[in-house]
Regions:
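Signature of exported/secreted
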Residues: 26-325
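Bacterial N-terminal signal peptides that target proteins for export
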Residues: 1-11
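Bacterial N-terminal signal peptides
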Residues: 10-20
Length: 325
């Protein structure tokens, strides 16, 4: 084959590749450059969610302890004919599992329902209660074996409900004061969220003392792009808590106070259905580093890794997952 023919073939191939790339770019530009309304009202329908959180404690030498795995099965149904009427959430099942041990159920939460809706000021907190989730429901919990859950375990279960609504509502829906997902119009935009540098209430338990506080860092949301989850087109929105800090004062017994001081950083992604605006999937990772002082005892340094996945599932799949334990 002559050099001229080879050069001609090479040039034609290059032109074809450039033309194909140009066509793809022309098709992609309207999608990538258009404006989206991610805060549009959600479709009025029932939803079914499976949530799993794994908590891993590290020894001071870096050894990983067997993980605690918490699972929440939550249904959601319209409470009225309008989204303004809110949604009725029902807990079908909550379980925990240590390492490879048996999955253990929390019977008192089976069938527990609550109304989740915006208040008159547009927020989700109800009467000073964080996201309207009554922490009293999580006092004195016992598992299906009749064992009383220690306060830290009960708090982790309570916190699953808080995390669920923080990600699926606080981050994924319009904020009343601005600085929310409604400000993300184009792919590539990033905002500082209204939750940045705030101090959420720490009145989470009768054992938590005055002086406890959690301070958010620079919480951000970023419109990363578009994705597909199980065949459903979604907007991909990243979140990052920045450098958060906390002080927790707990009295497990009248004569013992435990003071925990530390820092937290969590980050993850929301997958929001483009058609319905419901959250299809959430992934979250968190690292917590703290020092625990138990009265006159030696202080203990603690490192905790936490990962969470929330998935919307079909009703039949939900019923299958909610069986057992």
């Amino acid at each position: 084959m002559s050099k001229k023919v080879l050069a001609s073939i090479t040039a034609m191939a290059l032109l074809s590749a450039v033309f194909t790339w140009g066509c793809k770019q022309a098709m992609a530009e309207p999608i990538l450059q258009r404006e989206y309304d991610l805060a549009e009202e959600r479709s009025l329908e029932a939803r079914y969610y499976h949530m799993e959180t794994k908590v891993v404690y590290f020894e001071e030498d870096g050894t990983r302890q067997p993980p605690f795995t918490f699972r929440l099965h939550l249904t959601c149904a319209p409470a009225g004919r309008s989204p303004q009427d809110g949604y009725k959430y029902t807990c079908a099942k909550v379980t925990y599992q240590k390492g490879d041990g048996a999955e253990v159920r929390i019977p008192s939460l089976d069938g527990w329902s609550y109304l989740f809706k915006r208040t008159k000021n547009g927020g989700f907190d109800q009467g000073g209660v964080v996201l309207g989730i009554d922490h009293g429901k999580f006092q004195g919990l016992k598992d299906s074996n009749g064992n009383a859950l220690p306060p830290e375990m009960a708090y982790m279960i309570y916190n699953m409900f808080i995390d669920f609504h923080a990600f699926c509502n606080d981050f994924a829906q319009r904020t009343a004061s601005g600085k929310g997902i409604q400000d993300l119009k184009r792919i590539g935009q990033k905002i500082v969220h209204a939750a940045a540098f705030s101090e959420p209430s720490t009145e989470l338990s009768d054992n938590i003392e005055e002086g406890s506080k959690f301070v958010n860092g620079e919480v951000t949301l970023e419109f990363k792009g578009l994705s597909v989850v199980e065949g459903v087109p979604c907007a991909l929105v990243g979140f990052d808590s920045g450098d958060s800090s906390f002080v927790m004062l707990v009295k497990p017994t009248p004569d013992l106070e435990v003071k925990t001081v530390g820092a937290s950083h969590y980050w993850g992604d929301l997958y929001i259905e483009l058609e319905s605006r419901w959250v299809r999937k959430v992934t979250m990772g968190e690292l917590v580093v703290c020092k625990v002082n138990m009265g006159g005892h030696k202080s203990v340094n603690s490192v905790v890794e936490r990962s969470t996945t929330i998935r919307a599932v079909e009703k039949s799949k939900f019923q299958q997952l909610a069986r057992g334990a």
